[in-house]
Amino acid sequence: MSTNPNPGIHQYAPSTLPREREREGATNSPQRNLLEFLCICVACIVCYYNSTQCGLVFDDISAIRDNKDLRPHTPLINVFLNDFWGTPMRKEQSHKSYRPLTVLTFRFNYLLHALEPFGYHLVNLLLHLSVCLLWRRVCRLLLRQCAASGSNAISAPSSSSVSQLNTCAFVASLLFAVHPVHTEAVTGVVGRAELLSSICFLAAFLSYAKSVGDSGCPRRTNWLTLFGCFGSCLLASMLCKEQGITIAGICVVYELFVVHQLRPLHLCHFVLRLFDERTEQQSPKLANPSGIRRWSSSTLWKRLSFLVGITLTLLVGRVYVMGSQLPIFTRFDNPASAADTPERQLTYGYLIYLNCWLLLCPSLLCCDWTMGTVPLLQGFTDSRNITTLLTFLALGAMVAKTCFTRNLALSRTLIMCLGWMVLPFLPASNLFFPVGFVVAERILYMPSMGYCLLVAYGFEQLQRRGSLSWQRFSQAALAILLLTHALKTHQRNLDWRTEYSLFMSGVHVNQRNAKLYNNVGHALENEGKFEEALLYFQQAVRIQTDDIGAHINVGRTFNNLKRYAEAEQAYVQAKALFPQAKPGVSYHARIAPNHLNVFINLANLIAKNQTRLEEADHLYRQAISMRSDYVQAYINRGDILMKLNRTAQAQEVYEQALLYDNENADIYYNLGVVFLEQGKSQQAQVYFNKAIELYPEHEQALLNSAILLQELGGEEARRVSRSRLYKVLENDDQNEKVYFNLGMLAMDESSFDEAEQFFKRAIHLKADFRSALFNLALLLADTKRPLDAVPFLNQLIRHHPSHVKGLILLGDIYINHMKDLDEAEKCYRSILHYDPHNTQGLHNLCVVFVERKRLAKAAACLQYAQRLAPAEDYIGRHLQIVLARLQKINKLPESAPERKLAYEDYDPLEFKLPQDRPTHKSRKRS
């Protein structure tokens, strides 16, 4: 055994790591490994099995249900071009959260079971279990290396010490498995970003430790492992979530204080030497030769350079992907970021305490901490500054302990715990840039690893050095902590079952957050409970009177309740909250796109009144003037212009919208409708096809293009038309229009039985579907089943009394097949009631008179019909036949029954044009 020339400074032992592995095999039995493995698995499953019964809620809606990047028809490359929510990274409204690997796993889930929540939650549970097991392995490695490097002897820790360290690692992973603050990351499906990133995060650390520790000497490096495994894991972690980049910082801490055994004071001394060469003479205690030699190690600088280089490279790449722009958030997302100095800095400091408190006491958890959840600290006199001060004192005390303790194992373990707590939290700390939230529980998933290790290490120290009573007390306290955490986690999962239960749990915790009340209102609104939703929206307005979104919600709910005057008033109030233009003063103000919805909603409400369409158009133009790239305003304005029959202008508006969003299927569809209105079917079909290319499930484009193809005719056109109609049915099997058009296709192919079934299905879904009712009746009549057609024709006339073709067909069946002239006459007279100049209805009424042998009345009727339609030859022919018969009857005696019947009910004035009827002049009184 060699002697150490510098007491308190322990030299690195080249044989430490190999001997450590030998010792591990002797002290770590397979039975214990299996038992710990099973305990962690059981803890995870017991805590989170009920999460698989939860639905897709909160952020899951945007990231999964509404994210087109998950759909199989979306090009896979889009996953790497868009942000986590499916918005192109180049767009201003993008959240700039680039997590393509996480989105790929969502896409895989969608491929297997679409939007069924169970699979998404099951994957999250398994990922959390994997993180816990990996964390146990990392803790074992870390604790043994810290203990070995801090030993006074070259040999590794004793067998009993290794066993205690393994217990510490097990406790850390078990506490991590059951901690309630992880519920949002595990039960919320979007938390998969944290889970995947953590797996790659831990794998990166293990690969780094392997690359610098395989040889047993810190002067050697396995560069292949470092570049290949570590680099890949670091990149993958960052592509799952941005926090993953911080593993490079943890590896720097590990390299300095564990691998090269530097002490924090060595680091201070080195920094001082950079600024003052005399430090060594003035501070001999700091000028430790061993520390200097370690700093001069070329291996250390090569590895640090590698870590810094790869980190900077990835950061530059990340900035490039973001388009060199930070995401833009509103002041409601993070109120402190919009506050003045010193309120902003004091609030940021208080948020650090709040995050620490959530780790220490996760009793009051909330899904949303934005808006007024945490009131801003009002200067230095705010009493909450005390908690901030105590937090920083506690952290400072731990830092001081690492610097001045002579127990090097303790020092290095504390350093790694602090590094694991602090570094992953830095991106969310507002230190470098303001973030879009106040507190986010899932952000604490990685930092909580360091916290759990710190608690476990404290427990291990009590077990090792405390008295028997302290050991029993610490064991009982740990058991209670694990049990209460597990129960809280299990109970917290129940809050995530539905959006309503989740947001109500938030309201119970925090009554100052207007967004929570808005979200409860949205949940009730989705269930059709508009009256209840209105109460929560109005409460949100009372809490945050300047929140435009809350006023919009109130207006929309009034609109759903058909209280249009109150809805308009709410929208006007929201509109009044926008920055007002001042004459002669120019200024720039950023308007959130979702706030501009007030113009859309107000215009849509006004447009219900046909006399106010121009006013609605003005609102759309006003919204466009505020944001020229506001595509939804262009789309809605185009609809208004179509109602105003200004199709050319509507076309220009839609084409302008394409300049800002040329991948919006709705715009291409609307352009297709414009060309359809202009009678340009071929151009319309081109735009419908483009809409389908961009969004293969676009229902209206599929339906309209199928109809155009059907009208085009031809076997290939009918085949494509049918495939598109069936595509619509895959997503909406209750669409009566699809069944009707499938029936029409079957008619074209003479598949009458199939057509009949499609028409009946359409009528079953919509009892007053006039086209389906008439075409089914016509089909039955044409296939020699006229009596079967009568019920459908009567149903048609009941819902649509003025349906002329239906009345004519029904009248014909009454005459030709049922011989019911009275009902036939009712049908034809009904036609003339709605359309007095309908030639066919009038002619058929004349035929009824002929069938009744009322020839005089029939002749007058046909003469009237001929005057209405002189070009119709068949009327003239029938008139000549009736007149010839009437001439023969007129030769009979007046008392003859045939002659009496011929002139029965005859009124010479019944069938006369208005100008042919005699007028009666009134005499003036003298």
Swiss-Prot record:
* Topology term for the membrane: Multi-pass membrane protein
Q: In which pathway does it act?
A: Protein modification; protein glycosylation
Localization recorded for this chain is:
Membrane; Endoplasmic reticulum
Pfam families documented for this protein? TMTC_DUF1736, TPR_11, TPR_16, TPR_2, TPR_8
- Provide Cytoplasmic-side residue ranges: 1-36, 136-169, 214-222, 260-303, 367-384, 441-442
Q: Which GO terms describe its biological process?
A: protein O-linked mannosylation
Q: Name the enzyme's class.
A: transferase
Query: Zinc-finger as a keyword?
Result: no
The function of this protein is: Transfers mannosyl residues to the hydroxyl group of serine or threonine residues.
What is the name listed in the Swiss-Prot or TrEMBL entry for this protein? Protein O-mannosyl-transferase Tmtc3
Species of provenance: Drosophila melanogaster (Fruit fly)
